[in-house]
């Protein structure tokens, strides 16, 4: 893992499998125009932490008590006691890795109450969703063989369309449980997604609770607009994999990339770097709990965290422009 000082207020952490050589000049296009990035306002509400329903080796309190975040060996704990405001506040750390799971308690806010993750972007193409025009029939729409009712919920935002649809398949996402996106115990599901334009830009809808209807679903905007996240799970249960959306416009049609960490390494690195009160345990912090994180996914989790030179270059360019 390497930390490189790029510009004032920005640190970059790159941790992934060695990049494989790409043929020139095939450098993938960025998901959004990096020259038109707007930093989100700190006043935006932080995501609401979801109930922790994952089985763990030990309770978070015990992990903290046993020193599973060993800051003493590097003197971080002594330094912060002597200089409590030198905790990373005002610094943005770009994590170039397998992504960050924004649903992990402790990756929500900084020590000063600012949002911990102001932006999440996918430069790996692992979450790219191919979208095609789709036409509803009455109060339902068929997407890849899935009939979803409650289309009136969509028409409330956009009465005339256009409407686009795509899917995300579990099998290409690697080994379970990470690939069991909807938490039903299988890894062969194909999950439909609908995209349409609202008054404030493109939005995503998904049947997140699996009830066959979009009626109770909420629109999900590009993460940069409001730090909205979503995930699939049976009603009343917490999604196992928290996702964000990258939505951009290409000549009047939407482009969608889902951002998620199906490998866990990027989230692990993020916790070490800047977690604050992990799982609600006061003081269960990373090295710089006051810092913010820029989650830039460059590695495909299903392929063991392998990345490409093009993904790294695009992410580094985005990080510098974002912090400028």
For each feature predicted by the language model, list its residue ranges.
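Sec-dependent signal peptide recognition
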Residues: 2-9
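Post-signal peptide N-terminal segment of mature Sec-exported envelope proteins
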Residues: 21-55
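Short, intrinsically disordered, charge-balanced linker/junction segments flanking boundaries
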Residues: 315, 319-324
């Amino acid at each position: 893992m390497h930390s490189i000082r790029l510009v004032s207020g920005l640190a970059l952490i790159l941790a992934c499998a060695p990049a494989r050589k790409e043929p020139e000049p095939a450098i993938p296009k960025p998901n959004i125009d990096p020259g038109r990035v707007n930093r989100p306002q700190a006043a935006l509400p932080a995501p609401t932490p979801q109930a922790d329903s994952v089985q763990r080796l030990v309770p978070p309190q015990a992990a903290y008590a046993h020193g599973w975040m060993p800051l003493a060996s590097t003197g971080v704990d002594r330094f912060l006691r002597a200089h409590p405001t030198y905790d990373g506040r005002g610094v943005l750390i770009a994590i170039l890795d397998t992504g960050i799971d924004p649903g992990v308690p402790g990756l929500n806010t900084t020590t000063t109450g600012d949002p911990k993750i102001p932006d999440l972007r996918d430069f790996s193409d692992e979450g790219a969703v191919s979208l095609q025009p789709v036409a509803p029939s009455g109060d339902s729409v068929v997407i890849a063989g899935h009939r979803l009712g409650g289309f009136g919920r969509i028409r409330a935002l956009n009465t005339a369309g256009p409407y686009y649809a795509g899917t995300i398949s579990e099998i290409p996402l690697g080994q379970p449980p990470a690939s069991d996106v909807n938490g039903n115990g299988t890894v062969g599901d194909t999950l439909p997604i609908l995209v349409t334009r609202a008054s404030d830009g493109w939005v995503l809808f998904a049947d997140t609770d699996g009830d066959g209807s979009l009626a109770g679903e909420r629109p999900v905007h590009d993460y940069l607009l409001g730090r909205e996240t979503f995930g699939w799970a049976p009603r009343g249960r917490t999604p196992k994999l928290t996702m964000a959306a990258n939505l951009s416009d290409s000549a009047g049609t939407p482009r969608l990339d889902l951002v998620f960490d199906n490998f866990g390494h990027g989230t692990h690195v993020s916790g070490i770097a800047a977690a604050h009160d992990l799982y609600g345990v006061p003081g269960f912090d990373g090295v710089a709990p006051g810092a913010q994180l820029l989650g830039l996914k460059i590695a495909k989790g299903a392929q063991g965290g392998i990345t490409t030179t093009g993904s790294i270059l695009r992410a580094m360019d985005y990080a510098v422009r974002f912090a400028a």
